[in-house]
Amino acid sequence: MLGIGERMNLGMPNRYLFDTMEARLLLAGRIRVTKPDVLFCPLPLDAHPDHLAASALAEGARFYAKYTKLSLEGEPWYTPRLFYYSCSHLHAVPDYSFLVDISQHFEKKME
């Protein structure tokens, strides 16, 4: 659906996702290798601990991926755009900066 050529799992299982330095560096290395133009992460306004950790982890890894003096695989890279998506476990309605209408793709998503 997204046209992504590869899906990676960094070995961080459900309910055991934590924002640690080890996890940040692991993700930062993947960011350096893949050089994404955009990162997506959960909005850090959520009741689910994994979603909060994923948000902090993505922000931290994005920051560390640009450092020149870290011995990580790949060349330093700074992802220019970071977008947050809402999981709405709190049923909160944040003041979004923009919304994307996915209604024409919803049926395919449900497959």
Name these PLM-found stretches.
Residues 12, 18-111:
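Metal-dependent de-N-acetylase/amidase catalytic core
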